[in-house]
Amino acid sequence: MRYDKAEFKSAYGTFSQLPESDLPEIAFAGRSNVGKSSLLNKLFMRKSLARVSSVPGKTVTINFYDVDGVNFVDLPGYGYAKVAKTEKQRWAEMMEGYFNSNRNIKLVVQLVDMRHPPTKDDIMMMEFLQQTGYEFIVVMTKSDKLKKKKEYTERLENSKKEMSFVQPDRIIPFSAENGEGLETVKKFIEQYVGG
C-alpha cells in the first residue's frame, strides 16, 4: 500500500453529507487530543496532511483521506468536557450514522493514551465495536512519554488487564516521535484491506 500517495479528500460536518461509497474503509477513533492526526501523518509519511492541534475537540468533522483506493476515515474525537451539549449531540449522531450505515469498514483503529488508564468513553467505544462485530485494534499512543522502562511495562500490562476483552496482540504501543508500533499498525491495516 502506497501510504505516501495519501490525499485529503474531504471533510463532512454532518452524517447526512457523507457520500455513499463501497470502497474499503479504515476508521480512526479515539478521545480528543489522543493523537489520531499524528498517527495518520506518520502513516502518510507527511508532517501535516492531517492537522495536528494542541486544542482538544479540534476535529469536529469526519475527514476522509484516499490511500491507494482505501478510505482512511478520521472520526471526530470524543470525551472533551468543554464541548457544548449541542456539539456532543452532533458528534453522537455522526458516529452512530457512520457506524450504522452499512459502509465497507474493514478495520477500526481505536486510539488510547498509553499514559493513562482507558477512560469510560474508551471502554464504551471498544465494547460497542465488539458487540457490533467490527474488527478493531487498540493503538496506545504517546508511548515515548513513558520514559522509564518499568513505568512503560507496568502501564502496558495494566492496559491489557483493563482491556481484557481485547486480544493482547491487538494492543499496540505507538509513538509518533520514534515510530514505535507503526509497522505493526500497517500490517493490521494491510491484512484487512488485502495489502
Model-identified regions with their sequence ranges:
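Conserved G1/Walker A P-loop phosphate-binding module
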Residues: 1-80, 194
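Conserved nucleotide-binding/hydrolysis micro-motifs of P-loop NTPases
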Residues: 58, 70, 77-80, 115-117, ...
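Conserved nucleotide-sensing/catalytic segment adjacent to the nucleotide-binding pocket
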Residues: 67-105
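Amphipathic alpha-helical transducer elements in NTP-driven molecular machines
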Residues: 88-92, 119-123, 153, 179-182
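Conserved C-terminal guanine-recognition region of P-loop GTPase G domains, centered on the G4
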Residues: 96-169
